[in-house]
From Swiss-Prot:
This is Catalase. CDD domains: catalase_clade_3. The lineage of its organism: Bacteria, Pseudomonadati, Campylobacterota, Epsilonproteobacteria, Campylobacterales. Its EC number is 1.11.1.6. It comes from Campylobacter jejuni subsp. jejuni serotype O:2 (strain ATCC 700819 / NCTC 11168). PANTHER family: CATALASE (PTHR11465:SF61). Its cofactor is heme. Pfam families: Catalase, Catalase-rel.
Length: 474
């Protein structure tokens, strides 16, 4: 029989009763076991994520089946390479106790434990987003969270923002479509969303977008189906994912990329780094490159899912960033959020720790349990050959820029072409669902805001605006 101990291995003789002065007397301060239990309970929770708070996770692997050596030198993308990973799904707006089956964007964040360090691809289940400049991000998230006075979600705030920021129309159309409430995490696609870069052995740059197509098929819920499910099970997505993996019904996704040569970037006809737009598949076709599978559940949700920490700043040789303003901001904001939420040394936790060799001069900090390896010197530059040194062969190619530093308003104000193309792809039933979902989300919204929004939908398609108006009258 295992002996019960406290956090420091001290054997506990009585775990049922507090130490008191007499049977009916007050408690004694020397009851260190009671104090330890209470103090630990007070600190069991860390700050929840300000976005993507409610989530589920699983381990798996990615296998590359295509030859991408012409585009990238990243070892993870060598043909036949198998790389372990951890994937965290999430909703965006809701708190940690929110229901899984709400109408919301889903997070799709992957940590690849590559031979060259961790690569984090922090995406969503949509290829676009509501905004293209991170300067608006805090304000946008405020519209999705609770009103500070009423502590209620506000349709008025959401539609006020969307109608004043028409670049959001593409993502709003996706969110309000039949795909706005996936039936489960297994039955939705994933996207890197941002534009990233590939760099090959010749130090040539290519622009790339990542896609993950579910092999379980797309399944969605209507508003009514979601409401009925939430009434029965607020953890429906978590339950579905966990049970599927436990039953060895491992979910899979086909991995695809869109690749565009640096010299061809102007041929798109719009800013290729605009997160509110997609790259048309007719111009930049999808390329199948492999398969991703999830095959292992976490053993401890808090340790492995709640403390999982992702950041787009984690990249490996052969993969780089782009001038996408949203991506640029996330490079800072994500690791900053993790340091606040988990601590300075969050990277040392098992779920976040690289499986490759780590050689750094970063030392100490709260909760640092790593052994220091640089015996020759603890600073850099230094004179000792056996200490870690920089390697200039990993420098990225130059990125040609032009213009002066100022706060630039986007030059591309075509907010309607891509939402129109998406709307025209929908069948009659999908359009009807779209109209009713938008009308339902406009409940309680000021008339002037609805009027402003309808003018934008009219510019996408007269049928779009007409359908919403009709649904609003019911």
């Amino acid at each position: 029989m295992k002996k019960l101990t406290n956090d420091f291995g001290n054997i506990i003789a009585d775990n049922q009763n507090s130490l008191s002065a007499g049977a009916k007397g007050p408690l004694l301060m020397q009851d260190y076991l009671l104090l330890e239990k209470l103090a630990h309970q007070n600190r069991e929770r860390i700050p929840e994520r300000t976005v993507h708070a409610k989530g589920s996770g699983a381990y798996g692997e990615i296998k590359i089946t295509a030859d991408l050596s012409a585009y990238t030198k990243a070892k993870i993308f060598q043909k036949g390479e198998v790389t372990p990973l951890f994937l965290r799904f999430s909703t965006v707006a809701g708190e940690a106790g929110a229901a899984d089956a709400e109408r919301d964007v889903r997070g799709f964040a992957i940590k690849f434990y590559t031979k060259e360090g961790n690569w984090d691809l922090v995406g969503n289940n949509t290829p676009t987003f509501f905004i293209r400049d991170a300067y608006k991000f805090p304000d946008f998230i405020h519209t999705q969270k609770r009103d500070p006075r009423t502590h209620l979600r506000s349709n008025n705030a959401a539609w006020d923002f969307w109608s004043l920021c028409p670049e959001s129309l593409h993502q709003v159309t996706i969110l309000m479509s039949d795909r706005g409430i996936p039936a489960s995490y297994r039955h939705m696609h994933g996207f890197g969303s941002h534009t990233y870069s590939f760099i090959n052995d010749k130090n040539e740059r290519f622009w790339v977008k990542f896609h993950f197509k579910t092999q379980q098929g797309i399944k969605n819920l209507t508003n009514q189906e979601a409401a009925e499910l939430i009434a029965k099970d607020r953890e429906s997505h978590q339950r579905d994912l966990y049970n599927a993996i436990e039953n060895k019904d491992f979910p899979k996704w086909k991995v695809q990329v869109q690749i565009l040569a640096e010299k061809d970037i102007e041929k798109l006809g719009f800013n290729p780094f605009d997160l509110t737009k997609i790259w048309p598949h007719s111009f930049v076709p999808l390329m199948d490159i492999g398969e991703m599978i999830l095959n292992k559940n976490p053993q401890n949700y808090f340790n492995e899912v709640e403390q999982a920490a992702f950041s787009p700043s984690n990249i490996v040789p052969g993969i780089g960033f782009s001038p996408d303003k949203m991506l640029q901001a996330r490079i800072f904001s994500y690791p900053d959020a993790q340091r606040y939420r988990i601590g300075t040394n969050y990277h040392l936790l098992p779920v976040n720790r690289a499986k490759s060799e780590v050689n750094t001069y970063n030392v100490a900090g709260a909760m640092n349990f790593d052994s220091y390896k640089n015996d020759a010197a603890y600073y850099e530059p230094n004179s000792y050959d056996n200490s870690p040194k920089e390697d200039k062969s990993y420098l990225e190619p130059d990125l040609v820029l032009e213009g002066v530093a100022q706060r630039y308003a986007p030059l591309d104000n075509d907010f309607y072409t891509q939402p129109r193309a998406l709307f025209n792809l929908m069948n009659d039933d999908q359009k009807t669902q779209l109209f009713h979902n938008i009308a339902a989300s406009m409940e309680g919204v000021d008339e002037k805001i609805i009027t402003r929004a309808l003018k934008h939908f009219e510019k996408i398609s007269p049928d779009y605006a007409k359908g919403i108006k009709k649904a609003l009258e019911k």
